Amino acid sequence: MDYLKILLEDSSLAADFDALFDFFLLDEPTERDEVEGRCTFSLDGKAFARDGAGGEYHQLEDGSIGYVSSEGQCGRIAESIDDLIHLLVYSICWHDYCDSSQYTDMGTLEAYANERHDEIASYTEMDIWEEVVKALGMPSEANVAVELQKFYDAAHREPLYQGFYHEEDGSITPY
């Protein structure tokens, strides 16, 4: 499904989506923020969305999705736009699911996912969440652990999506 098209065509839905998931869709793909030419990346891509803290979502040359946080963390987070939207919608605050020690097996991941989801849902406007899910034509129930496993697999797939900061002294710092 073309979720981005749906969001671009419905500004009210896009505003609700941004409020719930901290995901502001750009009007069109743009060059990535390269900090005045001092940052380079391991894969080509374009920025297509931002979050409220200054992070960027990048569609990479192979169609997968990368993310660069304002703190300098960089990596692939989804294999496709559809996988990204599922990650955002079903894990709500995907940044809160990054404890790699919880991804050892599906049982551990399911317990972690359920615990985090219940906590996040307790302070999320779930009535608006339901409206957004319905407007996007997505099921209201999903196995969060399955979505998180796809996230983990994308993040660890080679080649890794990395950023590099070019220091004034000529050295390069990966992030």
Where are the language model's segments positioned?
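Compact, glycine/acidic-enriched structural inserts
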Residues: 71-107
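A surface-exposed partner-binding patch
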Residues: 1-72, 103, 120-175
